A protein has these predicted regions:
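Iron-sulfur-associated redox domains of electron-transfer enzymes in respiratory
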Residues: 1-162
């Protein structure tokens, strides 16, 4: 069940050729081992912590893996609400863009919230990069802030200060 370190793996390694790949945040593996185990089944499992590892390097590594080994699938799993974990999703989207492959792998994005695995779209990670679009979503759907209050300690703290 131990995940390999993606930054320490050769992009042309035989195990990557046409493989189903998992890139999971270290916290997913450490805090939710059952989720990591389930996602790892039938996949080459890698772990990464973008708080510790350079995400620009990670993006380049993913682009090189896509270009050189043509994986069939890439799944990213991170901790919901973690600002640095969000970078894993962004790195994959950016790597796909940089490669510009017409024959791209199947891509899935997941977040883990309170032990539950939730699939999110590639677009969710893209929109998260554009705060003015997030602002529009809040204005159209202000109840998002009520839901945020159920999960975010920072939001609860900021709400009390207003």
């Amino acid at each position: 069940m131990a995940g390999l370190k993606i930054t320490e793996t050769w992009v042309k390694a035989h195990l990557l050729r046409g493989a189903r790949v998992l890139l999971a945040a270290e916290c997913v593996k450490n805090l939710y081992p059952e989720v990591f185990k389930r996602l790892s089944e039938g996949r080459v499992a890698f772990t990464c912590c973008p708080e510790v590892e350079n995400t620009t390097l990670l993006m380049g590594k993913l682009a090189s893996i896509i270009r050189c080994s043509e994986p069939a699938e890439i799944v990213v799993a991170s901790i919901e609400g973690s600002p640095h974990c969000l970078l894993l999703h962004m790195a994959l989207n950016e790597a796909l863009f940089d490669v510009g492959a017409t024959e791209r792998p199947v891509v899935r994005h997941y977040v883990v919230l309170e032990g539950q695995l939730i699939e999110v779209s590639e677009e969710a990670a893209r929109v998260a990069r554009y705060l003015h679009l997030v602002q529009k979503a809040i204005e159209k759907c202000p109840e998002l802030l009520d839901e945020l209050g159920r999960y975010s300690l920072e939001h609860k703290w900021a709400s009390r200060r207003r």
